[in-house]
């Protein structure tokens, strides 16, 4: 059976980067084969769908699907990668898989109107894996961003992402219970707090 059919038959849940079995199956196959996630999958001659796959590669893909189904872990935890607005982020079980409409608002400039020439310090409260802090620093090169989280584990993941994107001089990470350790003042506060329980 195809990977998508196997995921559907197992009633796998989606929503951590993909919305359906087909998209998640494509992501897992491309990732396991080391192919770009934006690879053409259609009938075009240059499509990776026409590329031969060795038995060893097939076995690796099958093992990944088996792990996804058996553990029920989001694919992002298996691949250690999640994407927001076309930007890749490292993720593991120390932080929630990032998903936020705020990322889209940062990317499309919707928040820009709230900034002024006097905007210098932005706080990303409940930063988790640091994705919104990184995206804010990318969107606003003249701004210093602080990512705060109560979890030292989440901050360790955020540190990986800040370094990965070369923003260690502009994104500072602080362990803080809400605003206790980051009293400000802040010109703008972003916040996408965890809203799922441990079972989700």
Regions found by a protein language model. Give the residues of each.
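Alpha-helix termini
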Residues: 10-15, 109-117, 166
């Amino acid at each position: 059976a195809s990977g998508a059919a196997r995921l559907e038959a197992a009633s796998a849940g989606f929503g951590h980067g993909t919305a359906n079995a087909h998209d998640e199956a494509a992501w897992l196959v491309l990732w396991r084969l080391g192919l770009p996630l934006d690879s053409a999958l259609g009938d075009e001659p240059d499509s990776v769908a026409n590329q031969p796959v060795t038995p060893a590669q097939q076995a690796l893909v099958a093992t990944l699907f088996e792990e996804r189904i058996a553990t029920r872990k989001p694919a992002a935890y298996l691949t250690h990668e999640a994407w927001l607005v076309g930007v890749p982020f490292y993720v593991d079980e120390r932080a929630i898989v990032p998903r936020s409409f705020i990322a889209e608002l940062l990317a499309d400039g919707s928040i820009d109107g709230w900034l002024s020439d006097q905007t210098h310090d932005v706080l990303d409260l409940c930063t988790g894996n640091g994705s919104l802090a990184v995206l804010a620093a990318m969107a606003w090169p003249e701004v210093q961003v602080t990512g705060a989280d109560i979890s030292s584990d989440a901050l360790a993941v955020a540190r990986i992402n800040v370094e990965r994107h070369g923003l260690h001089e502009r994104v500072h990470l602080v362990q803080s219970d809400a605003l206790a350790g980051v009293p400000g003042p802040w010109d703008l506060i972003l916040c996408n707090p965890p809203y799922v329980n441990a079972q989700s």
